[in-house]
Amino acid sequence: MKREELLVEEIKDLTLEELKGYADFYKILDKVYGFTAESVVRGVKILKDMIKEADLRFLSFTANLVSTGLRGLFADLIKQGYFNVIITTGGTIDHDIARSFGGKYYKGLFEYDDSMLRELEIHRLGNILVPMESYGKVIEDVVRKYMNEIVSIKKEWPVYELLWEFGKRISDENSILKAAYEKKVPIIVPGIIDGSFGTNLFIYSQFTQLKLNLFEDMKLIKDLIFSCKKSGALIIGGGISKHHTIWWNQFKDGLDYAIYITTAQEYDGSLSGAKPREAISWNKIKPTSENVVIYGDATIILPILSASLLG
C-alpha cells in the first residue's frame, strides 16, 4: 500500500458538547443490567457522588488514550472543573504536544503489516497511525523553541509548573496541557523522562542549567492529600499513573471513591489488574469507600460516564 492510501481519515477530538444528547444513555444500560452494564451504571453513580462530595478529585490515565479522540474529552473534563489533579504518563505529554503543534494522527487497523509501516515511516499505536513527522520531530522542535525562554525565567522547575509553561504557549482548545494551565490543575507525571518530551528535556539539560525537581511535585501531592476532607479517583488503565494515585492516598487512610476502567486481569498479580479490594488491604482505598471496576475499552466507557455528568 502507498502512504497516501493509509493516511486518509484524521483522528478528531471529542468534546463534552457533543455528548449532550447522551446524558441518559446509562439509564438504558440500567435496564439491560447484565454483566458489564451494571458496573457502568454503578460507575456513573459513584462518579456523580465523587464530584459532589470529594474536594480532591484525581483523574488518572495512560498515554495511549491521548492518541485517540478522548484527548479533547480529557481537556473538557478539566475545563469544567470535574477533576483538580491529573496523574498520567510521559507519553501523554508527547501526544498532547505533538497534536497541539500540527501533528496529525490517523485512523488505521490493528492488522496492518508493521514492517510495511516502518518502510513508509508510519508508527502504529493499536489501530491509530502516527506519521513519523507528526511525532518526534514536532516535540523536539517545540522543546527547542520554548526552553530558552522558560529557563530564562528560572532554571529549576517542578514538573507540574513546567507543564503549565508549555500549556500557556498552546492555542489548541483540545489540549490537555492548555486546559490544565488555564484551570491551574497540576499534571503530575512521575515517569516524565519516559518519552520523547522527557528525553528532549534531558538533552537540553546537557547544554544548559535546566533541572527538574520532582520532589516539589511530591510535596504538592502531599499537601493536597493532607488538607483534603475526601478524595476520589477515576483511574483509567494501570501502570505508574494508577499506582501513583492510590499510593499517595494511603497517607489519608485511602480513597473515599474509586472507579477503575481497565482491561487488565488480577490473576498475574500485576498492579494494573489489581482490583480495589486489594488496594483496601494496602490502605490505599477505604473499606467504606464507594468503588467499582468497569471492564472494557475506555474509548467506549469514558464517553458514557462523561455524558452522564451532563444530565
From Swiss-Prot:
Keyword Amino-acid biosynthesis belongs to the record: no
Pfam families: DS (PF01916)
Catalytic residues in the record: K284
Organism domain of life: Archaea
EC code: 2.5.1.46
Keywords from the named record: Hypusine biosynthesis, NAD, Transferase
Record has Cell membrane as a keyword: no
Similarity-based family: Belongs to the deoxyhypusine synthase family.
Protein name per UniProt: Probable deoxyhypusine synthase
